[in-house]
């Protein structure tokens, strides 16, 4: 069994065969975006040096930057403690978001609503 085969056995894909992949700039640790991968997208990401995703809407593989030039070069891939989410660290060239912003999380931040939590909530809620 290769290292890639072993890694694939550790990933807990959804019932539809997908796993969320959080993309993070390797040197700033900024979270850039989230995309979906299936086993083939994971294999391509691990062997080609560029991040490949599976588009749920278009039902096809895509790589960030193929049309925009905003390429994501893979620096590392980690699996979370539950085995159901990937963290892909990249060297991002240009904007990560399809809107042209550096990160997909630059938009309207949501304010916490701590004053509205239930009385029965623990302090750690």
Swiss-Prot record:
Cofactor note (record): Binds 1 Mg(2+) ion per subunit.
Residues bound to Zn(2+): 81, 97, 104
Transmembrane annotation, as ranges: none
Record keywords: Amino-acid biosynthesis, Cytoplasm, Histidine biosynthesis, Hydrolase, Magnesium, Metal-binding, Zinc
Binding site for Mg(2+): 80, 82, 84
One Gene Ontology biological process: L-histidine biosynthetic process
Pathway recorded for this protein: Amino-acid biosynthesis; L-histidine biosynthesis; L-histidine from 5-phospho-alpha-D-ribose 1-diphosphate: step 3/9
Pfam families registered for this protein in UniProt: PRA-CH
EC number: 3.5.4.19
Function of the molecule: Catalyzes the hydrolysis of the adenine ring of phosphoribosyl-AMP.
Subunit structure comment from the entry: Homodimer.
Similarity remark: Belongs to the PRA-CH family.
Protein name listed in UniProt: Phosphoribosyl-AMP cyclohydrolase
Species name: Leifsonia xyli subsp. xyli (strain CTCB07)
Name of the gene encoding the protein in the UniProt record: hisI
